[in-house]
Amino acid sequence: MQGRVMPSDYQRIEQAIHWITQHAHEQPELGDLADYLDLSPYHAQRLFTRWAGVSPKQFLQYLTVDFAKKLLDESQSVLSTSLEAGLSSPGRLHDQMINIEAVTPGEYKLKGKGLEIQYGFHETPFGECLVATTPRGICHLAFVSNTGRQAPLHQLKALWPRAQLNGHQKATAELVSRIFSLGPVHVNHRV
């Protein structure tokens, strides 16, 4: 009698990421993922978080916001974007975008019109970075390459062409220090 071959943790996470990506528009629950992986919800949560660095719910939220941004870029309304992304209301999209992007869906759709964004360049253990913030948290982070500061600054301006961009080293320095410290960081809860 041959026993059942158990997939490795790596294979399970690969399957989980693929499955969540394929079912993101359905907004699946942890129990659905656990059933697919043939694990308890507790073990699915722990395994995914350990290997992916975020919970399955957080990963799903990132996918949802990414999809919503594409729809908003195509001039879809916030309501239709929310529904097409599988969310029950625009309020859920609003909360997810604030949490992940530090902007509302409307601010994103209007490319920052009426929004003030502060930015600064700072040294990190990984090289120099540009960090940009709204009053709600980080809306952009990019590392400076060999080509210099112009590329990340140009990228920021392209992402937020209608925002008021203000270079402000001091305002962003403390946040960058917290991000690259050794403790837990919560960056999108008021800077």
Where in the sequence are the language-model features?
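Basic nucleic-acid-binding alpha-helical/helix-turn surface characteristic of O6-alkylguanine DNA
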Residues: 1-85, 91, 95, 101-191
